[in-house]
Swiss-Prot record:
GO-annotated cellular components: actin filament; cortical actin cytoskeleton; cytoplasm; nucleus; plasma membrane
Function: Induces disassembly of actin filaments in conjunction with ADF/cofilin family proteins. Doesn't sever actin filaments alone, but caps the barbed ends of filaments severed by cofilin, which blocks annealing and depolymerization and allows more extensive severing by cofilin.
Any one Gene Ontology molecular-function term assigned to this protein's record: actin binding
Cross-referenced CDD domains: WD40 (cd00200)
Location, primary (coarse class): membrane
Name recorded for this polypeptide: WD repeat-containing protein 1-B
Keyword Cell membrane: yes
Keyword Nucleus among UniProt keywords: yes
Transmembrane region(s): none
WD repeat spans: 4-45, 48-87, 93-135, 138-176, 180-218, 224-263, 270-306, 311-351, 358-408, 432-474, 480-518, 523-561, 566-604
Record localization: Cell membrane; Cytoplasm, Cytoskeleton; Nucleus
Biological process, per Gene Ontology: actin filament depolymerization; actin filament fragmentation; locomotion; sarcomere organization
Organism lineage: Eukaryota, Metazoa, Chordata, Craniata, Vertebrata
């Protein structure tokens, strides 16, 4: 293969305030599962940088769970589709697909023999279904709740019991198979968010928005106690997870804490305070082997430390909204990837280990549209919040003084030498020097979309929606229109100079990449055809001979300058999502980012 995936830095869980987030464990204890958009993300619990992504759902996926055998995963989406797929092969072949009801699937449970499956959620005519995994034949009826069912679990020992938790403040208890409704437990005074049997089936825990956790006998459904007396948490409880030996219970709450409960003593033995910000609310949790995980409203996954409850020993960070732009810094001998997302977050990643973090302080408040490095430890970014920011890469801290307010919304930014920066805004081109606006061109007869600066000559190329590249030159503190335009094949979406400055590559909305020769007075060198939809981004390899382009067709092409027919096609680079930006780490390693909020690295080999 001329290309292969080298690393996947996965997205965070997609979270919503006031809604429980399920992170599910692996029966073998190696991985954990969660969802974001149309993707199911499988991550290694020991080393979260190892990740696998499943993207075969046509709609947003809500929940995914391993079968107890470990060989299959069932995942459910907002349309009510349930897909059961193979975990043993990279292709994740589909085994079965069902539509138990029309509406959002909110939770899934398997029997311990991996033969029966229960699915609950927001159906139109019913809120749940339980059936054989291989034929879809019904093995009972889920009744007893009169509102949306949020949670379901099946006792993992015989005789089987099934329980559901609903927005009608009740849990429904079933015996089977075939599963028959026995009674409702109406102890909660608010929505029931989570119901879970202990591993040996002796106990059942239910957690609700009233801040209470009730324990029941797993076999009979009789109430045993309320954990912590009248209140287990000061806020709603979104998730509970049993310890492997069933003696303790982990709970996650909107009061920004997680707690470990000693079930026999009916008391909290450890309380983890995870912050004071609203984004520190805890929406999900998982106890697997010796690991205790919780999910914050920020999307961060916390590895809780029993010995130091005040501070998680690891926090998985990243993006959970679409990534719009990226750049790579190779200055200190190792590669750092910078990414900016739709919600204004900027992350920096160690390209080797996947360790990442965000800048401290208050940064952009809206989509980060474009970014570039100035070669002296500064990242320059522009955003839909109408600002241009200079962020110091050594302190990694946003400073309010380093923000430049624009008259209109900026779209793209490019850095030249000598402290010059050019940004294109809606109907405007702005020149900045040493963090100050020094010149602007307002009366344009075209809409500027993208910009690149030739590092040697200071020529500024501005790509327009009129299908042309307009050339300007920096002269002192002003921009001079050179009166020359280059014809692209459609509205320009991105442009980039080769590292040696000899060529300019231009992508356009008509799926073409056009390369112009700088030395020949910007004459057209060649055109490169292959994309099936609008091309979005272009980046040159350090070897000056190859360049990569990405598009809305989910594809990445690696082109050869001297021969348009010699190309490497990477279909489904980010399946079901636009590939929004790319950058080269070295001559054989390409990094791509996408609306799936993931960062991928590819090893590209040339013949």
């Amino acid at each position: 293969m001329p290309y292969e995936i080298k690393k996947v830095f996965a997205s965070l869980p997609q979270v919503e305030r006031g809604v429980a987030k399920i992170i599910a464990g692996d029966p073998k204890g190696n991985n954990f599962l969660y969802t974001n958009g149309k993707s199911v993300i499988i991550r290694n619990i020991d080393n979260p940088a190892i990740a696998d992504i499943y993207t075969e759902h046509a709609h947003q996926v809500v929940v995914a769970r391993y079968a107890p055998s470990g060989f299959y995963i069932a995942s459910g989406d907002t349309s009510g589709k349930l897909r059961i797929w193979d975990t043993t092969q990279k292709e994740h072949l589909l085994k079965y697909e069902y539509q138990p009801f029309a509406g959002k699937i909110k939770d899934i449970a398997w029997t311990e023999d991996s033969k029966r499956i229960a699915v609950v959620g927001e159906g139109r005519e019913k809120f749940g279904s339980v059936f054989l995994w291989d034929t879809g034949s019904s093995v009972g009826e889920i009744i007893g709740n009169i509102k949306v069912i949020n949670s379901v679990d099946i006792k993992q020992t015989r005789p089987y019991r099934l329980v559901t938790g609903s927005d009608d403040n009740c849990c429904a208890f079933f015996e089977g198979p075939p599963f028959k409704f026995k009674f409702t437990m109406s102890d909660h005074s608010r929505f029931v968010n989570c119901v879970r049997f202990s591993p040996d089936g002796s106990r059942l825990a239910s957690a609700g928005a009233d801040g209470q956790i009730f324990l029941y006998d797993g076999k009979t459904g009789e109430k045993v106690c309320s954990l912590g007396g009248s209140k287990a948490h000061d806020g709603g409880i979104y998730a509970v997870s049993w310890s492997p030996d069933g003696t303790q219970l982990l709970s996650a709450s909107g009061d920004k804490t997680a707690k470990i409960w000693d079930v026999a003593a009916n008391s909290a033995v450890t309380t983890f305070n995870l912050g004071s910000d609203v984004l520190d609310q805890q929406l999900g949790c998982l106890w697997q082997k010796d690991y205790l995980l919780s999910v914050s409203l920020s999307g961060y996954i916390n590895y809780l430390d029993k010995n130091n409850p005040a501070k998680p020993f690891r926090i998985i960070k990243g993006h959970n909204k679409s990534i719009q732009c990226m750049t790579v810094d190779k200055s200190d001998g190792r590669s750092t990837i910078y990414t900016g997302s739709h919600d204004g977050h900027i992350n920096y990643w160690d390209a080797e280990t996947g360790e990442n973090n965000t800048f401290t302080g208050k940064g952009h408040t809206n989509q980060v549209s474009s970014m570039d490095l100035d070669g002296s430890s500064q990242l320059i970014t522009c955003s839909m919040d109408d600002t241009l920011r200079y962020t110091n890469l050594i302190s990694k801290d946003y400073s309010s003084s380093e923000s430049v307010k624009m008259d209109v919304q900026p779209k793209c930014v490019a850095v030249g030498s000598g402290g010059y920066v050019v940004t294109v805004c809606i109907g405007q081109i702005v020149l900045l020097k040493d963090k100050k606006k020094v010149f602007a061109i307002d009366s344009l007869d075209y809409e500027p979309e993208a910009v690149a600066i030739h590092k040697g000559s200071g020529t500024v190329s501005v790509g327009g929606a009129d299908g042309k590249v307009h050339l300007y030159s920096i002269q002192g503190n002003s921009l001079k229109d050179e009166g020359k335009t280059l014809p692209a094949k459609g509205a320009v979406t991105d442009l980039a100079y080769s590292p040696d400055g000899a060529f300019l590559a231009v992508t356009d909305a008509n799926k073409v990449v056009t390369v112009f020769s700088v030395a020949d007075g910007y004459s057209e060198h060649n055109s490169y055809y292959g994309h099936h939809a609008k091309a979005l981004s272009v980046a040159w390899s350090p070897d000056n001979e190859h360049f990569a382009s990405s598009g809305m067709d989910m594809m990445v092409y690696v082109w050869t300058l001297s021969d348009p027919d010699t190309r490497i096609k990477m279909p489904d680079a980010h399946r079901l999502h636009h590939v929004s930006s790319l950058a080269w780490l070295d001559e054989n390693t390409l990094a791509t980012v996408s609306h799936d909020a993931c960062v991928k690295q590819w090893t590209v080999t040339f013949k």
